[in-house]
Amino acid sequence: MKKLNTLLLVLGSLVATPSFADDSQALQDQLASLKSFKAQFSQKVTDKQGQAVMQGEGTIALQQPMMIRWQQTNPDDTLFVSNGDKTYYFDSFAEQVTIMQTSSLIDSTPFVLLTSKDPAQWEKYSVLATNSGFSVTPNKGVESQVEQLDITFAGNEQGLAKLVVTDNSGQLSSFTFNDAKVNTPLDKSTFEFTPPEGVEIDDQSNGE
């Protein structure tokens, strides 16, 4: 469950006060032009003292609206798939699948905003343009496990270059993307998932 909570910080991770409205709109416009995105990623996690605690790698696929496939292949094999309605998290080592409503994830992490156009969700966060991209932080009163999300775009319309997530404990997760394919058709099956036979299923999609 700890691995799932950590992943939700990121995925369920990418909104604005009036003073930052222009920056928020600029980020939304840039994300809106990203109809689909597929890449490999390398991950580095450091604690609040700056000490490395984990390194990993995997693949990511995003498609408008609200479709995500995130597979970590090292050090553990885990899969996170959202078809826009339901979200599936598969931990192959634990042989467990967790099923959630995608809409419930948006309130806890700004990452889902990468594929969301819902103004009500964006209003929960402040966006500030930086020298390297954009910084997203939850507004006061918004319950989020993410303290800050920094987004860097690649040049020449090559999509995302880097995401850096800082959680409430001060832990920092950095994701660097490479071999990206931008705005190319992705098969619908990319965002579909059928639990393997014999695995434990924890279905939280009905709010139980």
From Swiss-Prot:
Organism expressing this protein natively: Pseudoalteromonas translucida (strain TAC 125)
Region annotated Disordered, chain positions: 188-208
Signal peptide: 1-21
GO cellular component term of the entry, any: outer membrane-bounded periplasmic space
Function: Participates in the translocation of lipoproteins from the inner membrane to the outer membrane. Only forms a complex with a lipoprotein if the residue after the N-terminal Cys is not an aspartate (The Asp acts as a targeting signal to indicate that the lipoprotein should stay in the inner membrane).
UniProt keyword Chaperone, yes or no: yes
GO terms (BP aspect): lipoprotein localization to outer membrane; lipoprotein transport
Compositionally biased spans, kind Acidic residues: 199-208
Cellular localisation: Periplasm
Keywords: Chaperone, Periplasm, Protein transport, Signal, Transport
Pfam families the record matches: LolA
Keyword Protein transport attributed: yes
Record note on quaternary structure: Monomer.
Cysteine pairings via disulfide bonds: none
NCBIfam families: lolA
Record protein name field: Outer-membrane lipoprotein carrier protein
InterPro entries per record: LolA/LolB/LppX (IPR029046), OM_lipoprot_carrier_LolA-like (IPR004564), OM_lipoprot_carrier_LolA_Pbac (IPR018323)
Family: Belongs to the LolA family.
Gene3D superfamilies cross-referenced by the UniProt entry: Lipoprotein localisation LolA/LolB/LppX
